[in-house]
Every structure is written in C-alpha cells, then in structure tokens.
C-alpha cells in the first residue's frame, strides 16, 4: 500500500505531506510471508530499487517527504538494515555516502485511494514512464526470481 510514515502529523493528506512540514515521508507498506521471502531480502530489494545516497530526493522529486528511510518494527529488523548499510558501505557499492534513515515505525498512514495501485491506474504518467518503469525493468533483469508470476 502507498502511504506516509515517519512524521508527527496524525492522518496526513497528500497535500499536507508535500509541503514538507509534516515530517512524513512517502512510503509503501509491504505485507509479506516470511516463509516465502525474508526481511533481509526485502531490504536488499529496497536498496537496489532506489538511490540511497540522494538526500531528500528520489527521481525528479525533491523534499524531505522523498527521503530514503527504512522503517523497522523490532531490534532484529533494525540490525538487518544497519548490517546491510554497513555491507554496502564496506563494499563501496555507491560512490557517495548512504543517507538512508533507519527509524522505528510508529504509525503508517494509508495514502488516498488515487495513490493506490498508481502504476496500474496511471500507465502513461510521466513519473511512471521515466522513473518507475525503468526501475522495474532493471529489477526484472537483476532479480527475476523475486517477481510474482502474475505481476508485471
């Protein structure tokens, strides 16, 4: 699901979040079966799916609401995230410093309905065409085994 997390404003709307004053980041909630995929793999996908060295920016979008942030629900998840960042840093995967925030998830707020399934419902949107599709196509090449057969 698309939504917002990491800020102070209760029940934020998209128009509040894009001001950058709520403290929330645009986020997704991932519901998964740990018997099928583990949290560590999801973290690998997270880091492979965006540029974690960009401060307050993803694609053409700028502002604190577009920051790279990984949320955890327990100390084990926190350690997995921190260990992965350490591994990427040690291996010099990126030429710049990783700026991803690692924060406890206090509350996830669902975004408005028109933000859900955005790619499917807006296939000709310029962000979808210029940012999302290229990321997905790269992922299909690098990690095809992680895609559901009925998706994309």
Residue ranges and their predicted role:
Residues 1-152:
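Flexible coil/turn and secondary-structure edge motifs
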């Amino acid at each position: 699901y698309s939504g917002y997390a990491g800020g102070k404003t209760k029940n934020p709307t998209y128009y509040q979040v894009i001001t950058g004053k709520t403290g929330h980041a645009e986020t997704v909630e991932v519901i998964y079966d740990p018997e099928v995929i583990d949290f560590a793999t999801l973290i690998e996908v997270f880091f492979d799916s965006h540029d974690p060295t960009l401060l307050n920016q993803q694609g053409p979008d700028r502002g604190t609401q577009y920051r790279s942030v990984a949320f955890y629900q327990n100390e084990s998840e926190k350690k997995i995230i921190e260990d992965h960042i350490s591994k990427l840093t040690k291996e010099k995967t990126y030429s710049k410093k990783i700026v991803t925030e690692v924060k406890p998830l206090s509350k996830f707020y669902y975004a408005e309905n028109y933000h859900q399934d955005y790619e499917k419902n807006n296939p000709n949107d310029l962000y979808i065409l210029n940012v999302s599709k290229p990321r997905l196509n790269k992922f299909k090449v690098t990690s095809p085994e992680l895609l559901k057969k009925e998706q994309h």
